């Protein structure tokens, strides 16, 4: 049964760059695509996000001589994990997965566009002061409850879920429609933070059975 019109599906970074063979592959990342496609028709409203980095982006290890991917450096806004080069603007790596099918999506939000600031969350950049405008866009359309899925659970999904709660939305993470990087315990920490913030968990099977 379709969910009410005050619900929206938020698909986080279902891009080639996070799939097997991509610049920053998440294990089994491609397994989420058919799950998202099956549950997408439950939603009248949907938003997709897209990591969209310039080649000079501060989060790329390649832009820091002597550093390796997954090193952590200090930036003016705090600790920054250095990543393999991924999702560079206009490249196939940055494209949405070709089999992703969410035709009712009303917005594609591109994030991580500024060279000197990373952006995991769909709502607020990593400096924690620059907002993307998504919360206001959703509030203006009467959205009250967000269902999150995508990549990766412990980074962009979790940061988006926490910021959505802070912005006043009910939030449910659809677990089987996500996969994690799990860097040094990051998945357990992310779930602890999300649980503390009141983020709910669900499965796509549960949603489809309701």
What are these regions (language model features)?
Residues 109-112, 174, 202:
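Hydrophobic residues at beta-strand termini and immediately following loops
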């Amino acid at each position: 049964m379709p969910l009410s019109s005050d619900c929206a599906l938020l698909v986080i970074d279902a891009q080639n760059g996070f799939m097997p063979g991509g610049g920053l592959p998440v294990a089994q990342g491609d397994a989420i695509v058919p799950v998202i496609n099956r549950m997408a028709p439950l939603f009248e409203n949907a938003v997709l996000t897209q990591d969209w980095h310039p080649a000079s982006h501060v989060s790329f290890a390649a832009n820091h001589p002597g550093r390796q991917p997954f090193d952590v450096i200090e930036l003016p806004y705090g600790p920054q994990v250095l990543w393999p080069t991924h999702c560079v603007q206009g490249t196939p790596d940055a494209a949405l997965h070709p089999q992703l099918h969410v035709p009712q999506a009303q917005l594609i939000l591109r994030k991580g566009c500024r060279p000197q600031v990373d952006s995991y969350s769909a709502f607020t950049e990593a400096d924690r002061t620059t907002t993307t405008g998504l919360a206001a866009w959703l509030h203006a359309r009467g959205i009250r409850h967000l269902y999150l899925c995508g990549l990766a659970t412990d980074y962009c999904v979790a940061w988006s879920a926490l910021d959505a709660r802070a912005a006043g939305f009910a939030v449910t993470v659809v677990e089987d429609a996500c996969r994690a990087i799990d860097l040094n315990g990051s998945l357990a920490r992310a779930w602890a933070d999300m649980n503390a913030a009141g983020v709910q968990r669900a499965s796509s099977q549960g949603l489809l059975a309701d």
